[in-house]
């Protein structure tokens, strides 16, 4: 992969992220599933433009519930969820497709169409929002070059490795350059070496100005990327920390140290 783009100075990033309406806001949000299981309980958080945020915590803590609420796959039981100032509970059904055009989603299991080529899988994301053929022919090769798959346009998903399939998933999510990218366990099915490449790619997308929210169990990634960490437990936010670790009291491994070098990140979360 080509070197990561030069990152803005920290003070420029702070000004960019603190100005204007948050990209994501949860205001005292609770979600109770049928049967009484509590997915989230009185969760409040704000995520600014251009931030990179990890959602961490044990299985069932509420990470995926947050992602699904932001996609409007689920409805909150109580509270308000806003994306760029627009309330999701108050949003008419007819406006939901427009909302989803501005959100890219990367899943753990890729969710590729098995009977379509790499090119067609990515093009489909543009077809469903009504882009014309000329635009599709321009955008799809560009995004496949970005993710390192320019030679795989005509391959089918079953001809690709897991890492390559996830790159197709990322290309599909980002081909329309949405302001918000949601990633639900993006390295969950990948080995450590492949995971480095996937996180390099997501990090590179974030540095274009896209807000990135990653729900993950991947301790090594979280520890050495040192981005904002929001920890959930039993549906509640128990920690919200800038430049955080997966678990603040644990040391880092040799793999995590090498990962930090691969990503070009310095000691306090800034590029080397």
Predicted segments, located by residue:
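Conserved ABC transporter NBD signature motif
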Residues: 79-87, 139
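ABC ATPase NBD coupling module
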Residues: 34, 88-104, 133, 205-207, ...
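Helix-to-loop junction immediately C-terminal to a conserved catalytic motif
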Residues: 71
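A short, proline-enriched helix->beta-strand linker immediately N-terminal to the Walker B motif
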Residues: 175-179
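Short coil-to-helix segment of the ABC ATPase nucleotide-binding domain corresponding to the Q-loop/switch region
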Residues: 116-123
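Conserved ABC ATPase signature
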Residues: 156-160, 164
């Amino acid at each position: 992969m080509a070197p990561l783009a030069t990152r803005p100075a920290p003070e420029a990033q702070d000004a960019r992220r603190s100005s204007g309406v948050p990209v994501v806001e949860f205001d005292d949000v609770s979600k109770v599933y049928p049967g009484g299981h509590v997915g989230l309980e009185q969760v409040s958080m704000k995520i600014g433009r251009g931030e990179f945020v990890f959602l961490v915590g044990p299985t069932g803590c509420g990470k995926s519930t947050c992602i699904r609420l932001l996609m409007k796959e689920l409805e909150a039981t109580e509270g308000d969820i806003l994306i760029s100032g627009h309330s999701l509970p108050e949003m008419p059904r007819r406006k939901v497709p427009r909302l989803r055009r501005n959100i890219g989603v990367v899943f753990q299991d890729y969710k590729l169409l098995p009977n379509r080529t790499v090119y067609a899988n990515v093009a489909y994301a543009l077809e469903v929002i009504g882009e014309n053929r000329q635009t599709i022919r321009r955008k799809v090769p560009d995004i496949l070059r970005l993710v390192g798959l320019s030679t795989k346009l005509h391959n089918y998903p079953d001809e690709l490795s897991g890492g390559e399939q996830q790159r197709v998933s990322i290309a599909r999510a980002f081909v329309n350059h949405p302001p918000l990218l949601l990633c639900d366990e993006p390295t969950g099915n990948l080995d450590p070496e492949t995971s480095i490449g996937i996180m390099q790619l997501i990090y590179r997308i974030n540095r274009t100005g896209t807000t990135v929210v990653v729900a993950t169990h991947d301790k090594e990634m979280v520890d050495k990327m040192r981005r904002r960490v929001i920890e959930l437990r039993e549906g509640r936010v128990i920690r919200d920390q800038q430049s955080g670790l997966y678990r603040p009291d644990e040391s880092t491994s040799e793999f995590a140290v090498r990962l930090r070098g691969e990503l070009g990140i310095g000691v306090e979360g800034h590029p080397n």
